[in-house]
Structure formats: C-alpha cells, structure tokens
Amino acid sequence: MRSKFKDEHPFEKRKAEAERIRQKYNDRIPVICEKVEKSDIATIDKKKYLVPADLTVGQFVYVIRKRIKLSPEKAIFIFVDEVLPPTAALMSSIYEEHKDEDGFLYITYSGENTFGEAI
C-alpha cells in the first residue's frame, strides 16, 4: 500500500527527520499511522506519532481508537507491512523488524481485516 506521507515528503527529508527524532528521543519510536484507503473507518487527525518503545501493539491500538473516537463495539485492525502484528508485541520489536529505510515505522489501520494474515 502506498503511503501518502511518503508521497508528500521526499526520502531525504523523512530520513533526516527520523534520525533527528531517534537522537533526541532514543526511547521513542517514530510512527506514521494512516488509514487503509478503501476502509470506511474514520480518518485519523494526525499521522505522526512518537511512541514509547515499551508500549505494546495493543496499547497503541487503544491510542488510535481514542484519536478516531471509535465506539467500543466497532473493530479496528492495524497492519505493519500488510500483516497483523501480535497485540502483546512491543512497539520496539515491531520497529526493529519492520522499520522503513527512512527510519519510520509505517502502520495502517482499517475497520475490517483487509489483508487477513497474522505475523
């Protein structure tokens, strides 16, 4: 899936920003979170997040749910490289395994399990 953030910002600028963030906040993970294009779920108000390294994927999902004001009965799925990461996994381990060459971790979310595969 194409990232709008990548389309809007040149690689060198993204890489420099991620490096600056990691140097200044070495206990944080730079994350870009975008909605899957064809999903009917609400669009998030901001794409860039600075996530504590010890946050779990489940806790990050909770943050996203709050930001898009998703009611408890509605489902949300997040994807890293088009697969569902384990809920108990630490964001730091997901970052180490899946960070982009620009230094950001790209996460997409959807109201439906669009890709259907777990890591």
Curated annotation (Swiss-Prot):
SUPFAM superfamilies: Ubiquitin-like
Residues annotated as site: Cleavage: G116, E117
Record lipid sites (Phosphatidylethanolamine amidated glycine): G116
CC annotations in GO: autophagosome membrane; cytoplasmic vesicle; fungal-type vacuole membrane
GO MF annotations, alphabetized: phosphatidylethanolamine binding
Lipid bilayer topology: Lipid-anchor
Record PTM: The C-terminal 3 residues are removed by ATG4 to expose Gly-116 at the C-terminus. The c-terminal Gly is then amidated with phosphatidylethanolamine by an activating system similar to that for ubiquitin.
The name this protein goes by in its record: Autophagy-related protein 8
InterPro entries, sorted: Atg8-like (IPR004241), Ubiquitin-like_domsf (IPR029071)
One Pfam family here: ATG8
CDD domains on file: Ubl_ATG8
Origin species: Phaeosphaeria nodorum (strain SN15 / ATCC MYA-4574 / FGSC 10173) (Glume blotch fungus)
GO terms, biological process: autophagosome assembly; autophagosome maturation; cellular response to nitrogen starvation; mitophagy; protein transport
Keyword Ligase assigned: no
Family label: Belongs to the ATG8 family.
Keyword line: Autophagy, Cytoplasmic vesicle, Lipoprotein, Membrane, Protein transport, Transport, Ubl conjugation pathway, Vacuole
Propeptide: 117-119
Main location class: membrane
Known function: Ubiquitin-like modifier involved in autophagosome formation. With ATG4, mediates the delivery of the autophagosomes to the vacuole via the microtubule cytoskeleton. Required for selective autophagic degradation of the nucleus (nucleophagy) as well as for mitophagy which contributes to regulate mitochondrial quantity and quality by eliminating the mitochondria to a basal level to fulfill cellular energy requirements and preventing excess ROS production. Participates also in membrane fusion events that take place in the early secretory pathway.
Subcellular location: Cytoplasmic vesicle, Autophagosome membrane; Vacuole membrane
